[in-house]
From Swiss-Prot:
It comes from Listeria welshimeri serovar 6b (strain ATCC 35897 / DSM 20650 / CCUG 15529 / CIP 8149 / NCTC 11857 / SLCC 5334 / V8). CDD domains: AdoMet_MTases. This is tRNA (guanine-N(7)-)-methyltransferase. GO terms for cellular component: tRNA methyltransferase complex. Pfam families: Methyltransf_4 (PF02390). S-adenosyl-L-methionine binds at E44, E69, D96, D118. Belongs to the class I-like SAM-binding methyltransferase superfamily. TrmB family. GO terms for molecular function: tRNA (guanine(46)-N7)-methyltransferase activity. Pathway: tRNA modification; N(7)-methylguanine-tRNA biosynthesis. InterPro entries: SAM-dependent_MTases_sf, tRNA_(Gua-N-7)_MeTrfase_Trmb, tRNA_methyltr_TrmB_bact. Keywords: Methyltransferase, S-adenosyl-L-methionine, Transferase, tRNA processing. The active site is at D118. Its EC number is 2.1.1.33.
Amino acid sequence: MRVKHKPWAKDRLEEFPAIYIKNPEDFKGRWQEVFGNNNPIHIEIGSGKGQFISGMAKANPEINYIGIEMIESVLVSALDKAIEADVPNLRLVARDAKLLEECFEKGEIAQIYLNFSDPWPKKRHTKRRLTNPTFLTIYERLLPKAGEIHFKTDNRSLFEYSLVAFSEYNMLLTFVSLDLHNSDYEGNIKTEYEEKFSAKGFPIYRLEAKFDRN
């Protein structure tokens, strides 16, 4: 999807330092200071326009959330939703997922959300998929032993690829749904994409997984 460039996005984000963290590397290992508490930290990689992460922060005040989106012109929409939600447990960061280890210490993140990530369908772009083993290695370092990855997509090919990638990485699949909205799963908070695709009748695929470190 092509994103309309918003030249004013960076300045707009920087107007709200209580929400937008301009230099997340400065807080590596010190994110508890940012939030002012010791609550667990959950991150969403590729948070887009922010509907999911804002909804999660509002529904779970006992958890700290960080929405990560590399495109500032998109992240500025997430900022607007964060302002509207008016929650103290949400921060936003503009960074590429490849740089996460520069922003977070080992084991500092309790849970990772991957929602409707770019499927990168061409074979030569496989390594760009956020469920590629290269990224799984990064996630494994960021998560504690009990940490989990929650993944949602409407793209069956990406879901099947991810199931295989997680399994070959010796991860434990603790939840798998091939049609989330017609399952017994409760507490689902939809993303903008999720609302769009489910309204057209597409099934939503979801899984939960954790690293097997026994």
